[in-house]
């Protein structure tokens, strides 16, 4: 997130400072906002399914990486390290997959992973990949979405045509490989009876990201600036505490 240069010098952008405020509250006050939502939940649950899909599409087995990487400035764990760094993002539904693009945040994330992996001794390319994967949504999440929609529609009778069509559409928006879904959840009672699977190769979107020497200089500089900001923030907070 530390990637914006303002006129008149290199300064931390507003977004970075907002994030640093959260980091400070977590470290100093041991308070932080708990982030857990349906998007993160699905991403965590289907992480290995995304790697499996990517493996099948590219004809290479990609194992989940569990190695925690860090250097003096960064830390993190990419999803896969094989010849190059790969990180998968599992979209929540069809619409979000169609709109998915390489964001600035994800680009810097991949660059950071490449830098740390090379520093840890991995013989990899300086080009990594961000891979969006469209994976079946877990059944309990589909059930939750159906229940929420049922309330939003005024609790219609389940045999009403408008309800049946809406529930069927919702299932199609979250299930892309019906054979695998039935294999994973054989007891799930589906509304929809007409299925058109999306081919596996059309359920992966890959963006390449290359690490340049200037990127390393930028991350190093911004990391030092962030540490200095946190130190000054601590001094301010201690002065405020001791002011009375």
Predicted segments — roles?
Residues 1-45, 49, 53, 57, ...:
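Charged, glycine-rich intrinsically disordered N-terminal tails and low-complexity linkers that flank
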Residues 25-26, 94, 108:
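Domain-wide signal for the mature, well-folded portions of proteins, strongly enriched
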Residues 39, 51-73, 78-79:
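A short acidic/basic microdomain associated with nuclease active sites
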Residues 48-58, 101-135:
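Metal-dependent nuclease catalytic cores in nucleic-acid-processing enzymes
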Residues 54, 78-97, 113:
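Conserved catalytic cores of phosphodiester-cleaving nucleases, focusing on short active-site segments
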Residues 58, 66-69, 82-84, 89-92, ...:
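Short, flexible loop/turn elements at secondary-structure junctions
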Residues 94-96, 137-141:
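Short catalytic/ligand-binding loop motif for oxyanion handling, primarily in non-cytosolic enzymes
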Residues 193-244:
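Extended amphipathic secondary-structure runs
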